[in-house]
Every structure is written in C-alpha cells, then in structure tokens.
C-alpha cells in the first residue's frame, strides 16, 4: 500500500534542496564551512521547520555548534530567500540543529570493530 505524502513532507523536501544550494552559494561566513542538510521536519501547519545539519570536516563538536549558531543567526535571511524561491506566501520559521547521528553511528561502528577484533583474538588464543 503506498504511503501518503502530506504537503508538509513535500515542502520539507523542497526546503532541504533549496537550503543546501542557498547556504553554499549565498551565505558568506568563514565559520560555516561545508554544511550538509541531513533532514528537514516541517510541522503540519507549515509554521516551523527544524533543519538538522552536519559540518563536513569539523574536527570537534564545538566547530559544528558554531556553524549551527551562524545558521540560526542567518535564519531570517534564509527564510526570505526560500519563500521567494518556493513562491510561498510565508515560509516556515527555520531552526537549525546539529545532527549527531553520523558521529554516533561512527562510534557504534568503532565499538563493533573492536568487539569483533577482541573476539577474533580470543578465539586465536584458545586455538593455540
């Protein structure tokens, strides 16, 4: 059975594509770096959009948090550009959040790799 797509889902996808382009081309802040828009959640009434981002090449989480603060300060400008681009009468209010899922996934992968290596070492030690 096909899943229904609500208008808010379509708007979220359009905002994600638009933000990815606008942030790279029109936001000129050296603290920003290369930003990935991971997902956008828009409320059903289209009044608020939560934008989850990661910063490529950020060595520490604090660098990503600085980028999120820069994006939140530029939210009004970005909202205006998106409203014009998507020809919306009023665009949702944008709130940016650092998406920790990539970091958590990498940490989990490292834990699994260490557990597999320890298990392999243990089985080799028992085999001798």
Curated annotation (Swiss-Prot):
Alphabetic keyword roster: Cytoplasm, Ribosome biogenesis
UniProt keyword annotation of Lipid biosynthesis present: no
Keyword Cytoplasm attributed: yes
Molecular function terms, GO-annotated: ribosomal small subunit binding
GO BP terms in the entry: maturation of SSU-rRNA
Subcellular locations according to the entry: Cytoplasm
Main location: cytoplasm
Family the UniProt entry places it in: Belongs to the RbfA family.
The protein's assembly and partners: Monomer. Binds 30S ribosomal subunits, but not 50S ribosomal subunits or 70S ribosomes.
Protein name, per record: Ribosome-binding factor A
Source organism per UniProt: Saccharophagus degradans (strain 2-40 / ATCC 43961 / DSM 17024)
């Amino acid at each position: 059975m096909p899943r229904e797509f609500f208008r808010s889902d379509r708007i979220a996808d359009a905002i994600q594509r638009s933000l990815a382009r606008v942030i790279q081309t029109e936001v000129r802040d050296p603290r920003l770096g290369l930003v990935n828009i991971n997902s956008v959640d828009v409320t059903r009434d289209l009044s608020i959009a939560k934008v989850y981002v990661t910063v490529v090449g950020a060595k520490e989480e604090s660098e990503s948090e600085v980028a999120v603060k820069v994006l939140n300060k530029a939210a009004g400008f970005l909202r205006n550009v998106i409203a014009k681009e998507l020809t919306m009468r009023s665009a949702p209010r944008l709130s940016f959040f650092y998406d920790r899922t990539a970091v958590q996934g990498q940490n989990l992968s490292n834990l699994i790799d260490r557990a597999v290596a320890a298990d392999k070492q243990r089985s080799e030690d028992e085999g001798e």
